[in-house]
Design a protein with these regions (language model features):
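Predominantly soluble domains enriched in secretory-pathway, periplasmic, or organellar proteins
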Residues: 1-318
Length: 318
């Protein structure tokens, strides 16, 4: 996995200034996400694998030896460079981690990362087993990973996180013990965890579910404070029940994907991959306001400053 820094500041040359190679990840999802003040750049694995400091491991040992992960790369704004020596990684289960977003305002200090294939399916169609995609879609839900990067940062600075191949790595055991990592069921095969401008809600769409789910940060924090969990995953990570974290669900259409925000309160736009449409909807009330047909199998979309605390509205690019 690699992260690239390009100089796009006004008057600059738009050339690549830095390429950072991950010392542990063998793959990553093609998306980099920054915390509100660009303290960190979030990079998640996509396909679980043995970390780079481990040799070959057969698929038969997938559950025990393969791992996912989420790295918070420290960014020095004065120098315009990523600082690997001040970055850190969360070890995560061998689920396929997907897109991320950082909390803002009320949820500042926390990060949210999707996942798919929590079935930990490894294929085998040549042996008469279901195709990989089918095996990775057999459950109704996957997991939203909730990480407390602010507290993790303090542990790293205090020298309380062990190094691995030159990178501080917070093991799952340490993350659980320190209250840094939680899981929440989400509609299966999601693609996008989008934090609302006020930081109060997290919007998740599952490509294989017609509903878009809106999670409440306040409810998530209440469940954590009360120790209200429905159980643990196979790696001991506490699971917050979906019903205890959910604010509302909205049935937007087929294949909801990526969400961006309007300048008007509670208004968002979500791409519908299967319907080839964009839905305009109220995420506070869970009501569809409008739909428009658009390019075949639309993917991501963007509104003017639509992922900031002050979206500008005016235009949507699909």
């Amino acid at each position: 996995g690699k992260v690239v820094k390009i100089d796009a500041k006004k008057g600059k040359d738009f050339e690549t200034k830095q390429i950072v190679t991950h010392p542990l990840f063998r793959s990553e999802h093609g998306g980099a996400f920054v915390t509100p003040n660009t303290e960190y750049v979030m990079e998640a694995t996509q396909y679980a694998a043995p970390y780079s400091d481990v040799g070959y491991v057969p698929l038969e040992e997938f559950n025990d030896k393969y791992r996912g992960g989420l790295t918070y790369w420290k960014f020095n704004k004065d120098k315009g460079r990523i600082e690997p020596e001040n970055s850190f990684t969360f070890e995560l289960p061998p689920y396929s981690q997907d897109l991320s977003d950082a909390g803002k305002k009320d949820s500042y200090g926390w990060g949210f990362t999707n996942s798919f294939c929590t079935e930990r399916y490894v294929g085998g169609i040549e042996r008469g087993r279901p195709p990989f995609e089918a095996g990775c879609s057999s459950k109704d839900t996957d997991f939203l990973h909730v990480t407390n990067w602010k507290k993790a940062e303090e542990l790293v600075k205090a020298g309380k996180v062990p190094m691995r191949n030159g990178m501080p790595v917070i093991s799952m055991e340490q993350a659980v013990a320190e209250g840094l990592l939680y899981l929440i069921p989400e509609p299966k095969s999601p693609h996008g965890a989008d934090v609302t401008p006020d930081g109060k809600l997290i919007i998740v769409s599952g490509k294989l579910d017609s509903h878009t789910s809106v999670f409440s940060f306040e409810k998530i924090m209440a469940a954590i404070k009360e120790g209200k969990f429905e159980g643990k995953d196979p790696y001991g990570i506490p699971i917050i029940a979906m019903k205890d974290a959910l604010h509302v669900q909205a049935e937007l259409g087929l294949g909801p994907l990526h969400t961006q925000f309007d300048s008007k309160p509670c208004v968002a736009y979500t791409s519908l991959y299967v319907d080839s449409m964009v839905a305009k909807w109220d995420y506070c009330e869970g009501k569809v306001l409008d739909k428009i047909s658009i390019h075949y199998n639309i993917g991501h979309l963007m509104t003017m400053e639509g992922d900031t605390v002050n979206p500008d509205g005016k235009y949507l690019v699909a």
